[in-house]
Amino acid sequence: MRDAVIVSAVRTAVGKAPKGTLRTTRPDEMGAAVIKEALARVPGLENTEIEDVIMGCAMPEAEQGMNVARAAAIRAGLPVETSAMTINRFCSSGLQSIAMAADRIKTGAAEVIVAGGLETMSMIPMGGHIIRPNPYLVEHYPDFYLNMGLATENVARKFEVSRADQDEFALRSHTRAAAALDAGKFKDETVPLHVVLEDMDENGKKQRREVVFDKDEGVRRDTSAEGLAKLKPAFHLKGTITAGNASQMSDGAAAAVVMSDSRARALGVKPMARFIAYATAGCPPEEMGIGPVFAIPKVLQLAGLTLNDIDVIELNEAFAAQSLAVIKTLGLDPDKVNVNGGAIALGHPLGCTGAKLTASILRELERRNGRYGMVTMCVGGGMGAAGIVERI
């Protein structure tokens, strides 16, 4: 079986939903921007070579419905002969799309695929506009639809994750993210977007202005342990999860160009990484956040690696409680996990996140001269996902 390599990976800066800079930017336009830039970074690659576009989206309806991947591909200037599909595994959708592209390339079913993810939580709320649950599950297994915050409260209790530890983790996320932004660590992976905003001027008149959006806007530099400690529980009166130690609602998009190693050699392009393995696993929906505990051992086995082999880990911070439970249960090295902050500070644009984290981990492996990186996350409905890349 041949190798599938990532030769380009980019993302937008992450907007803070629902009132941030990307609040009026359509998801297909964000997707088009990252697809176009990802392709532009591969010298010699013609648009006609792209056989398929796979984009993940957690809430594929309304502005991000109607096979939004196809709309994004056409808006990016790809020919009508290039097919496209939108896939959904909730929070792992962006990583799932890259894994699916890699699988098709490894088996010889394709040579070049663009894969990524997109999400606008400003336009499409968590759960979508109209939630219509399965009646049988509502009656016989209501926890299947348990609010993710309450599911994470279950995880916090079961794995004995304290409020103080959650707040400390959240503070570290903001501190690390601010330092990474100041050091320009995200600059190479970020595609600047020209955004037109409508707001009021100082006289109360509506005005239109264009801004260049190129920096994640969720980081709160004034975050403190004292401030976090004052926040009230968000999901349960006696709970420990607050708005400060949970991920943010966000907008964003990311895309990667995945191709066979032979095609990369023919183009004279140096791959960023080889996509090694991907695994998913199920867990009780009422303990949704613990999913990576089951997915990580599976992907390590598939890759023939151990945790000691992994140089950098991007563990999506859906909630501090579930992140800490995963770290504690598997014995992950905190110094390898989310070294530049995570979703608590940088945001979590659902279906985009897996592709976004892939773009980030590739740069961090390069900076550290590392070999293996792992992207992992919990998934709504009671699942976990994990993927491993090898820097070349």
Show which residues each predicted segment covers.
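Conserved catalytic cysteine-centered active-site region
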Residues: 25, 57-111, 142-153, 222-248, ...
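Conserved beta-ketoacyl condensing-enzyme motif
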Residues: 22-112, 117-135, 190-213, 286-287, ...
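Active-site-proximal alpha-helical scaffold in enzymes
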Residues: 87-118, 156-186, 255-262, 327, ...
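Condensing-enzyme catalytic core of the thiolase-fold
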Residues: 179, 255-267, 271-277, 294-301, ...
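Condensing-enzyme catalytic core mediating Claisen C-C bond formation in acyl metabolism
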Residues: 1-27, 224-290, 294, 359-360, ...
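N-terminal extracellular/periplasmic Venus flytrap/periplasmic-binding protein-like
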Residues: 11-13, 24, 28-33, 44, ...
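Short, well-ordered amphipathic alpha-helical segments that serve as non-catalytic structural scaffolds
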Residues: 27-43, 68-72, 97, 148-155, ...
